[in-house]
Amino acid sequence: MKRKDFLSTLLPLGAVLAASASTKNVVIESSKIPPYLKKGDTIGISSPAGYITLQEIEPAILKLKEWGFNIKIGTTIGKRDFTFGGTDAERLADFQQMLDDEKVSCILCARGGYGFIRIIDSLNFKKFTKKPKWIIGFSDITVLHSHLNANFGIASIHSKMCNSFPDDWAKADDVQKESIESIKKCLVGEKMKYTITPNAKNKTGIAYGELVGGNLKTIESLSGSKSDIDTTGKILFVEDTGEYLYSLDRMFWNLKRSGKLNKLSALLIGGFKIKKDDVGEEFGKSIEEIVLEKVAAYNYPVCFDFAVGHQKNNFALKCGVQHKLSVHLNECMLIEVK
């Protein structure tokens, strides 16, 4: 996983965002859902992983204010300790303050990179669990999504971060704008619906379950730790960037061997920016072949080319929230059901 949030479209994803229709006669249990935001609420911006400057997050600040939210800038913005947004102690203190501040209704991570795993075990979630708030991010922030789900059953939002907001909104691609706008839709409580162009390699079917997942390499790195997620009965989504095909094959084998694939409700495969094989060391399998080999014995639906990852079409997903996935030959759809 690279530190940079790549903005190039990696796979032909063709996702469309809209408010979903209600789904009836579905008995489900949900994670704890933080309160949705309203105009005038405060969003705190912190950088618990890689470093970023105030100038780099200004486009995000402008858009969030345009949506009607107030902004609190964390002390890590503008700080740098090598690749990190400040020392471990500084990043820990900033994020802890955001967690505990009752005036902050939501925490938006400024960027990913690497570093959350260095502070996750030192964070105190006591106040947060009593009064949860939405936490937003992806890539390295998968550490937090997984930790919240595994330990507290609290929902969070997997989406673009501050470093992905376009400098000039008027010149941004429509899909980039839609991806950013999906964050607002999640925050204000819209039920999300995504329609995905089918991939011929998909495994068809209909599934219900809690949505969990994130960056594949990060998920793999959490195996056996207190942040490791239980995927039983859940819809798992994964994405990654900057990896060789053989490395991805190893990661998916690890998921299979550790029991994360055998009891899924469904599997979503997002964008994968793949390193070119070294000459003479070609792996010989596509990402679809790698995945299908590992899930051949299972009957749940598998959807490729989902609009999540290090790319322009990286739509906001509510982790820990119940969804319905329908994978058909002519259409694939993910709908939030509660």
Residue ranges of model-derived segments:
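C-terminal segment of N-terminal export signals and the immediately downstream linker at the start
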Residues: S20-I52
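Short, acidic/small-residue loops that bind anionic groups at enzyme active sites
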Residues: F125-H147, A155-M161
